[in-house]
Structures are given as structure tokens and as C-alpha cells.
Design a protein with these regions (language model features):
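Canonical Rossmann dinucleotide-binding motif of NAD(H)/NADP(H)-dependent dehydrogenases/reductases
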Residues: 2-32
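Conserved glycine-rich Rossmann-like NAD(P)H-binding loop of the short-chain dehydrogenase/reductase
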Residues: 27-43
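Active-site helix of classical SDR
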Residues: 120, 156
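Alpha-helical segment proximal to the catalytic Tyr-Lys
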Residues: 125, 169-170
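Residue(s) in the substrate-gating loop at a strand-loop-helix junction
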Residues: 140
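SDR active-site lid
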Residues: 173-235
Length: 276
């Protein structure tokens, strides 16, 4: 990926999307940066002095298929093409599935699953005309293995992964690549909101959360360069997740162990926060 390309990103007001927008602009690319939270996105763009000649900041609710079509059409009319779509916007709230309000179920499914589907549809229609393109969809380790207290989130991320793998088969004959990225828990504002919640303990079972920088490095250096069908971050956690998915009964003994480890990490995080 030596020459400048046109990127369309969602979820750019914070977290992975924000970091990737910063990196891509620093590398000389053109970026169509979107988020449902336009004020936060605009503030970041101004603070980071995003180059106006290579970036456009737009509001986009990924749950709205018509909004997607309008956004892609506007981007193409100005940029001429969309070389890479990154579906990054996501939503997470840990809770027992039987206690989760309907509106929380809707947010998980609509943002995480339908948002990716609508975005991939809109971009694919344009990329088929172009004869090339790369679609990168962010799933999760929760899309590889079912996780207690994240049943609805897991369902949405399983949907992202399954859809992406199937879409890749349909789009490859048109010269379009699809990559699904499955990261472990990442240190983002969305994850930070779960730190105090007992239901979210398993999110913090890894000794250290992934950073947005680590995820960004993997996407820029590996995904954009090699266009793999699937990427696990980190690979050893991904392989463990696949093993548990292959033998689902393993989740019964392993789940409580990971949750216990996560609670311990949450406690240390709270102590560190108080100390600072």
C-alpha cells in the first residue's frame, strides 16, 4: 500500500476508528471519517488539525441503510472511488441476556450486525462498478466463542464474522477482498465503561487489554498489505477461542476461570485508578 488511497471509516469519534483515521491521514491518504457523534468527531478533527484537503467529517448512523447509501454516494462523488471501507463502529453493554432491555438488544444487533451489513452492501455496489476494493469488518473474539454475560454482543459479532466470510466468497470474483478482524478486548472508551460492572468481568480476563495502537498496526501493516480473509488479535487467544467454539462444552469449566481472572484485573484497575 504505497500509493495514496481513498478510505471510508465509521466510528471515528473515539477508539480504533479515531486512531486509524489519524494514522491514515498521517500516511497521506484521503479519509471519509464518520460517526454518529458528530460533535465529538469534529472536536477531534480540529484538535488534531486534520488536513481539510484530504478529509471529510460526516455524521452517519450506521443503523440506517438509506443513510449509508447517501454517504457512499457523496463520498464517491467527491473522491471518485472508495478503495477501502472500514466498518469499525460498534456497541457493547455486558449483562445477563434475560435481564437486558429490548432497546439494548436492538443497539447491539443494529449497530454491530446490521450496521456492518448495510455498510458492506453500500460499498460493495460501488466497488463492483470500480472492479476493485477492500472491505474490513471488525468482529471480536466474542465472534469466535460464546461469552457469558455477552450473549447478545456475541450474537452480533458472530453475525459479523459469518456475514463477512460469506460476503468474501461473493465479492472475490469482482476483485473485492473482505477481511474480518477479531480482536480481544481493546482499551477504548466503550470498554472503559464496563470496568466497574461485574457482568463484564470476562472482558478483562486477558493480562492486558489490547491498545488501539496495536490494533491499528495490525490493520495497517498486515490487513491492508496482505488482505487476509480473517485475522485474530492476538493469535493465541484467537486459537483458544476457536478451540472452545469447536468444543462448546469447554466453556463451562473455562468461562468461570476467565471471569475470576477478569474480576481480579478489574480490582487492580480500580486500585490503580484510585492511586493515580
Amino acid at each position: 500500500m504505497d500509493s495514496a488511497q481513498n478510505f471510508f471509516l465509521t466510528g471515528c469519534a473515539s477508539g480504533i476508528g479515531q486512531h486509524l483515521a489519524d494514522r491514515l491521514l498521517a500516511n497521506g491518504h484521503k479519509v471519509w471519517a464518520t460517526d454518529v457523534n458528530l460533535p465529538a468527531l469534529t472536536r477531534h478533527a480540529e484538535l488534531q488539525h486534520w488536513p481539510e484537503e484530504r478529509v471529510r467529517v460526516r455524521q452517519l448512523d450506521v443503523r440506517n441503510a438509506e443513510a449509508w447509501d447517501a454517504a457512499v454516494n457523496e463520498a464517491v462523488s467527491e473522491l471518485g472511488s472508495i478503495d477501502v471501507l472500514m466498518n469499525i463502529a460498534g456497541y457493547l453493554w455486558a449483562d445477563k441476556f434475560y435481564e437486558m432491555p429490548a432497546e439494548e438488544v436492538d443497539l447491539n444487533i443494529d449497530v454491530n450486525a446490521k450496521g456492518v451489513i448495510f455498510g458492506t452492501q453500500a460499498a460493495a455496489r460501488q466497488m463492483i462498478k470500480q472492479g476493485h476494493g477492500h472491505i474490513i469488518n471488525i468482529s471480536s473474539m466474542a465472534g469466535l466463542v460464546p461469552i457469558q454475560s455477552l450473549a447478545i454482543y456475541s450474537a452480533s459479532k458472530y453475525a459479523v464474522r459469518g456475514f463477512s466470510l460469506a460476503a468474501a466468497q461473493e465479492l472475490r470474483p469482482h476483485g473485492i477482498f473482505v477481511t474480518v478482524v477479531c480482536p480481544d478486548a481493546v482499551e477504548t472508551p466503550m470498554t472503559a465503561r464496563q470496568r466497574e460492572r461485574a457482568e463484564a468481568a470476562i472482558l478483562f480476563s486477558s493480562p492486558k487489554l489490547l491498545t488501539v495502537e496495536a490494533v491499528g498496526d495490525a490493520i495497517i501493516r498486515r490487513v491492508l498489505t496482505h488482505r487476509p480473509l480473517e485475522l485474530y488479535l492476538p493469535i493465541h487467544r484467537g486459537l483458544l477461542a476457536r478451540l472452545t467454539d469447536l468444543f462448546p462444552s469447554l466453556a463451562f469449566p473455562l468461562g468461570p476461570l476467565f471471569a475470576k481472572r477478569g474480576r481480579s484485573h478489574q480490582l487492580h484497575m480500580r486500585k490503580d485508578a484510585k492511586a493515580s
